[in-house]
Structures are given as C-alpha cells and as structure tokens.
C-alpha cells in the first residue's frame, strides 16, 4: 500500500473461508446460468493453483469476480474505462505496463495483462479482501486520502483521468457490474475495516469501493495505466504478473468471442 491510510497486506480479522460449495450465479434470472461458463474457466485454470508469494493462491471469490469484470470489459471494448485500460503503452512514470517493461502488441493483450497485474495488486494490497479499509493504526482520517477496497485506492486519485469521476458517478446510481456476490464469497469483515472515514464524496468513494468490488476493479484498471505511482507495490514491482493468470484472462476472452450471447447475460448482472 502507499500512503498513511493503507491497510497491512496480510494480518487482519478477515478470513477467506476454505473450500465452500460453489453457489450458482448471483441472480435468480435463469438466463444467466451460463455465466458459470465464464467463472468456471477461472476456477479450473492454472492461475487458481498459482501462489502469489506469501499471499498463497487467489481465493475462488476473487477469481470469479475478476473473471466477470474482465468479461464485461471484453464485451464493452468502446467503454471509456476499457479503452484506457487497453490503450497503447505509454510513459513509465504513469503507466504500470511501461514501468514493468511490458509491451503487449494488441489491445486484447494489454487488457489481459492489466487484469493479470490487478490480481497481483489485490494480493499485495488487500490479500484479495473486498472490505479492507484504512490501517487502524494510521492517524490520518481524511476522506481524500484514506484508502479502501481490494486495491487500496483513495479518492484523491480521481485527478488521474476525467474518466474516474464519471465512473464513480455511474456506479453510484447503477450497481450493475458490481459482481458483489462473486467477489465477496465467504469473506467476513471486521467493523474496523468496514468503517469509512471523513466527510463528503470521499466517504462515498470508500463505501462504494468496498460494497461494489466491480467498481473498484474498473477504477484500478484505469489507475494502472494513468497513475501507477498511487500504489506502493506497483512502484516496487512486488505486485506480480503470473503467466498462468494472463492466460486465464485470454481463455475467458476467447470464450466470449466464440459465444457473444454471454455479453447479453453479463449486461443483466
């Protein structure tokens, strides 16, 4: 994490419960059943068996949620956030892909690598826990700078791109794409982490980052391309990119391209 309000990377009162039975897709609409075709790719991938240093293997909940967020991006290539996340590699002082020395050739490949890096970022920033708030030992309680959610982002990051405040406003009124059931899974959270700090829109940002992990993920995708310096583990390159996880996202993209009807089901979630 980066700055005074970041959470410790591992120790917490939150626990990802082990091996719970798989639940059906998070909507009673029977037409959404085939979203399991997307999440099953993640759950059965080599990425699901790949350890990220001391953080271990990614939990089922994060794999399912990130699979659906990535699928949404693939289904909406002209959306503002997808275009930024998949744009050509830029300046290494701002762009995480350039900072890592990566040069994916196509927009598809750049999007896959960004989501793979986000998986490594979540490992370091929150141990893949959606509900992480500010470090309880930190004295700073400003709504502008207190970090929240999977990727420990703070509201003062919004100046990185005009797309970010627009994304925030969109998700405030439309929770489709949160994929909260998938991301949250069996994770339980302490009151200390669920608390939001300060006043104004920064409090709403903290709350939305926790309660709507899909928002936090799309926001982080833009941040990685526009202001990677916000994140200490990215700056230090301790957030890892695992080839098995990049391949997992590629396999999801290929599945969607072979079955475009999945995009219609995603749009209802």
What are the residue ranges of the model-derived segments?
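Short, low-complexity, disordered segments immediately C-terminal to signal peptides
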Residues: 9-24
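Peptidoglycan-targeting cell-wall enzymes and recognition modules
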Residues: 31-223
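Cys/His-rich zinc-coordinating "finger/knuckle" motifs
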Residues: 12, 54, 252
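Active-site or metal-binding loop neighborhoods of secreted/extracellular toxin and effector enzymes
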Residues: 203-269
């Amino acid at each position: 994490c980066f700055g005074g309000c970041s959470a410790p990377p591992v120790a917490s009162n939150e626990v990802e419960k082990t091996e719970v039975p798989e639940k059906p897709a998070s909507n009673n609409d029977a037409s959404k059943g085939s979203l399991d075709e997307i999440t099953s790719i993640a759950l059965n991938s080599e990425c699901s068996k790949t350890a990220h240093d001391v953080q271990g293997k990614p939990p089922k909940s994060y794999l399912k949620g990130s699979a659906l967020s990535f699928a949404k991006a693939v289904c909406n290539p002209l959306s503002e956030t997808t275009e930024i996340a998949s744009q050509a590699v830029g300046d290494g002082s701002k762009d995480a892909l350039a900072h890592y020395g990566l040069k994916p050739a196509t927009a598809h490949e750049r999007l896959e690598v960004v989501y793979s890096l986000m998986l490594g970022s979540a490992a370091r920033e929150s141990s893949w826990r959606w509900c992480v708030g500010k470090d309880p030992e930190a004295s700073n309680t400003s709504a502008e700078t207190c970090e929240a959610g999977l990727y420990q982002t703070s509201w003062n990051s919004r100046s990185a791109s005009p797309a970010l405040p627009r994304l925030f406003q969109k998700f405030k009124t439309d929770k489709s794409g949160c994929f909260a059931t998938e991301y949250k899974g069996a994770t339980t959270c302490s009151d200390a982490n669920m608390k939001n700090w300060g006043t104004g829109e920064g409090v709403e940002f903290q709350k939305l980052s926790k309660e709507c992990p899909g928002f936090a993920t799309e926001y982080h995708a833009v941040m990685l391309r526009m202001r990677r310096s916000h994140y200490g583990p990215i700056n230090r390159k301790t957030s890892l990119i695992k080839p098995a996880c990049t391949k997992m996202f590629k396999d999801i993209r290929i599945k969607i391209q072979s079955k475009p009807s999945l995009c219609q089901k995603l749009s209802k979630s």
